Amino acid sequence: FQDESIINRLGFNNKGVDYLVKNLKQKKYTGVVGVNIGANKQSKERNRIEDYLICIRKVYKFSDYITVNISSPNTKNLRDLHNSKNMDELIEKIDIEIKKLKISIPIFIKVSPDETKETLKYLIDRIIDSSLEGVIATNTTVDKTLLKQEKYHTYKGGLSGSPLNNKSNEVISYIRSLSRTIP
């Protein structure tokens, strides 16, 4: 509380995309509904991209936008999708799905605040060349040194709250400097 922050270790614990779609079909809420999709611990690394595509296919008709979350620090090796080879494959396959299914809702990539400028630039360049709409910046950070209380510096999980503000704003400013066209 002193740091106005939370460290979470939740990951993507849920009942799955089919359960989500069932709930979305029954929703009475009339506001904007965004669906955050991400690989969970049951997703095998070699199938993660296909898992994202399955989720997109199932939810796009029932949501106003989709967030492709590749930046949760609580799912083992998920941030590996930030490397160029994996990122290229993910964006290329999502782009194919968007065109094949004629998806008209925006799809965004949610990025980590811990990535290098080079990685962020690479991602932004790929997004600009695709049918994706933009990025959501940022997820939680693994950098606990942002906390005043040193006893929490070694805790596992994603840090959110006030200590992350400057780091997230730096990422947002950097992304904005790369392209005035990307939301």
Short names for language-model regions:
Residues F1-G31:
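A gly/proline- and charged-residue-enriched helix-loop-helix capping module
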Residues N40-L53, D80, N86, F108-I128:
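Active-site glycine- and acidic-residue-rich loops that bind
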Residues P73-N86, R126-I182:
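Glycine/Thr-rich beta-alpha phosphate-binding loop at enzyme active sites
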